[in-house]
Amino acid sequence: MQLTLWTYEGPPHVGAMRIAASMKGVHCVLHAPQGDTYADLLFTMIERRPGRPPVSYSTFNARHLGRDTAELVRETVTAAYERYQPEALLVGDSCTAELLQDQPGDLAQGMDLPVPVIGLELSAYSRKEGYGASEAFYQLVRGLLETNGASAGAQPDASRAPRANLLGPTSLGFRCRDDVQEVTRLLESVGVEVNVVAPLGASPEDLRRIPEADFNVCLYPEVARSTCEWLQRRFGQPTVTTVPLGLGATRDFLAEVGRVTGLDVSQGVADANARMAWYSRSVDSNYLTGKRVFIFGDGTHAVAAARIASEELGFEVVGLGTYAREEAREVRRAAKAYGVEPLITDDYLEVERAATEASPELVLGTQMERHIAKRLGVPCAVISAPVHVQDFPARYAPNMGLEGANVIFDTWVHPLMMGLEEHLLGMFKEDFEFTADAPSHLEAGAAPSPGGAAREEGQAETAVAVAESEEGAEVRWTPEAEAELKKIPFFVRGKARRNTERFAADRGIATITVETIYDAKAHFSR
């Protein structure tokens, strides 16, 4: 067990909650103690849902352990069915309740309720949230279709348009709502109808219609891969596995749809030329070429982000990793292609160390990487769950398809542009026009702070700055050297300071001057 301030994934039962919360007519019953009943906070505060998630808890405590806790499960399942009248029930236990070995899924299935009851065994002490969502969705789809007696998929019919299922979007996912809308529009542009979107917004009756489609689109492999593989074995439905994140992947996605359906999608591929393509070639974006980028997130978004960064924006990928061990193989393959060491970990401190060592100029990651980048003073864009409330925007902001490519360009490039602006302000902040005591350009400017001049005078009297080198030796910076260091762009200033201090310590230099900075630069440039 590890004590931590942050976790990229919750326990598996959180994944099961996400599936239930994504759907209509599905209720999740969890055998759980009082401390595991925090679903309301996740879904109402972070995702800004207008209603409570459809989850009920047995909520056992110490006094219940002296009697039959299995009876408490039956009472909770009965109460949940009578109150909510769901079309299907998911029943499992939380990580704490798993220790009791009450088997709540089996208990609920033995109650002969008039609705399908899907028991979940989620292996809480060896798996995490992503697996819980994948397993809950798979068991729900399989349970409903086998109960329904479905035996064959859709037969080819030239009189109608091909039909597709979009599988994988969930509550608490990254931009799922808008991605579904954009991919639906993209498919319709080449003559493909969307049959079912699941689990997001689907009902159990919708899941029973999945076999009516001609093929499945695995939009979010972390959730839908195992379900798509089973549907292909059971009903012969092919799966489109390309995720349309970025212009290149969108073209590949349309080409794969064309191969699966036999449609001529050449015009759609030719038209897949979003504004991002021009912007990334335009004069005002030339300075972006070669920017060092560190990427960390779920497997799907991390690998896609690396491709976009390298092939479409001309960035240099200096770090690539994921917290999802189920996606480690794909991330390792991509990392090898970009010549970097893959980072497979769910320890945010290890991610911070790797990001610091990589000295990136842009960080792409989750909510935690946003905090890491802020501490490092590096621009950041969020590309993957887990995210906080600001990444569930009220506006339309997909990441997939053509409009998604435009959104990605804006989201990634604007922090760099604003970073350049901050750097210029930093360079010229000593200019007489930018001092705190300078008169405002506004007609009724605020009066200058009376303490401003005193502060400036006090700063000027500071003779030297003291720093700790990596080897622990104390080195001093002259005021001229500190001023010269501030002229270096903020996103590499930390690296320049560390290199200079290391250079000085190695050579026994006690006081760093401007000449020392340039000597260190020449040394490390070789």
UniProtKB/Swiss-Prot annotation:
The keyword Iron-sulfur is annotated on this UniProt entry: yes
Record HAMAP family: ChlB_BchB
Protein name: Light-independent protochlorophyllide reductase subunit B
Domain of life (superkingdom): Bacteria
Record field: catalytic activity: chlorophyllide a + oxidized 2[4Fe-4S]-[ferredoxin] + 2 ADP + 2 phosphate = protochlorophyllide a + reduced 2[4Fe-4S]-[ferredoxin] + 2 ATP + 2 H2O
Root EC class: oxidoreductase
Record text on cofactor binding: Binds 1 [4Fe-4S] cluster per heterodimer. The cluster is bound at the heterodimer interface by residues from both subunits.
